[in-house]
Each structure stands twice: as structure tokens, then as C-alpha cells.
Amino acid sequence: MALPVNKRVPKILFILFVVAFCVYLVPRVAINFFYYPDDKIYGPDPWSAESVEFTAKDGTRLQGWFIPSSTGPADNAIATIIHAHGNAGNMSAHWPLVSWLPERNFNVFMFDYRGFGKSKGTPSQAGLLDDTQSAINVVRHRSDVNPQRLVLFGQSIGGANILDVIGRGDREGIRAVILDSTFASYATIANQMIPGSGYLLDESYSGENYIASVSPIPLLLIHGKADHVIPWQHSEKLYSLAKEPKRLILIPDGEHIDAFSDRHGDVYREQMVDFILSALNPQN
């Protein structure tokens, strides 16, 4: 027997509420697990850093640092490395992981995504893609940088953003791509945190969709086998989907984004430098 109209209405409203919750709120809760921004100052600015304010394509104001080579003029550096950091803190927290590069005659450009550090806005998948593309373009147009000698270096979620950029055709001047502790799929990581939530995320931003398009740009993937944040199998999968030239380094005792920390000394730093030099000067 059918329910009276006055009894069906609350039930229908409840069903609509549940549907709205699943469609609108759950995806936002899931994606928020990827972002842990703050504006805390983790250490002094690099002594030689130039503070750079720039605007994303959608008008969001962003903050970056340009740190020139410490061994000579910036326009004489081996290359300029554009660093896309992980999903927590801000660029001041990640500076120690790249602070060694200017001493090896590399310029470094770091930047904070929207909502991180002094950058305005709220993090989102589309927003971080916009921010990363905009940062690369800022570097391309600097008068003290060779725009044909750019290296993209992404750690954790930064690697996913870099793959998005490459996959959408932004390749001019990029001579090497380095991904450290990067995940292959947003959905897979989300499911680890909230089972089933991955189905509600936009997988069009996942790196596994674009990794094959990096070629013929040389690609280096590096991942610690003791990484409890992003399992190393993500890099293994990305490597399997990538085309040559490519290289995968797995660190037996490596933790999340610590390959270039002081814990490992110069072991992986030198391998990264050798990779970049090889990419810039390929053997025919």
C-alpha cells in the first residue's frame, strides 16, 4: 500500500539529503585529505632568495622564491630547477630538500600553491594544476634564466601536478622530469584513507593518465621502500606506464621524500645531478 503524501515527503527529502551528501560533501572531504597547508615559518628564507609574487591564470595571487646558483651568474647555471613541493606545510618547510642544488650550479624556483604559505586562495586539483603551470611560465620569462634548460622536480603531490602539466602539452624548454615519492592515482590514495571515496574524486588529474606523454623528455622516478605515506608501488606502476628514456631508483630504507635529505648524504643527490647532466647532454 502506498504511503500517504505527507509521509512520503520526509522520506524523499532524507534520500535527497543522502544523495547530496555523497555527491557534494564526501568528495570534498576526500580531496581535503590531500592538502595540509599552513603559513608557519619553518626557517629563515634562503639568504640569496628573491621573493617573487605572481598570479595564476585564474587571478589567484601566489608566492615564490628564486634562488640563483651560488657558484656563478644565474644565466650561466647548468639549468633552472622548478620545484613543486608536497602536500603539507609550505615552501619554507621544503627548502632543506633542495638547498644543496645552488651549490651544484643550479638555479631553483620554489613556489607555494594556493592556500599554502603566503599564497592566496583554497587548494583544489584544478587550482594546483593552474599554479604549477603559472610557476613554470614565470620562470620561462625571466631574463636571467635560459628557458631551454628547465628541469621539473616534483615531490609527492608535486609530482602529480607536474605530470598534469606535461600531459596537457606544456613542454617547452623542459629537459628533464624528476618525480620523488609520487602517487599514480588520487583514487587509490583516497581509498586508503576513506574506503570507497576514490570513486568520487576526479581521476582526470591522476598522474597515471599522463606519465606516458613525458617521453621523449628523460624521466627519473625515485621512491623509498619504507614510505608509509605513499607506497613505493605507485612509482613502480608509473615506471611501468612510462616510455623511454626512464629510470627508477628504489631506496631500501627510504622514507617519504627523504632521498635528498641529509640522512642519505650525497648518494641520491649525485645520482640526480648525473641524471640531469645526461638529459642535457644526451649521447647520440
Curated annotation (Swiss-Prot):
Transmembrane segments: 12-32
Keywords: Membrane, Transmembrane, Transmembrane helix
Gene Ontology annotations for the cellular component aspect, listed alphabetically: membrane
Main location as per UniProt: membrane
Membrane topology, from the record: Single-pass membrane protein
Superkingdom, natural source: Bacteria
The keyword Transferase appears for this protein: no
One Pfam entry name: Hydrolase_4
Leader sequence residues: none
Subcellular location: Membrane
Keyword Nucleotide-binding among record annotations: no
Family to which this protein belongs: Belongs to the serine esterase family.
UniProt name for this protein: Uncharacterized protein YfhR
Organism of derivation: Escherichia coli (strain K12)
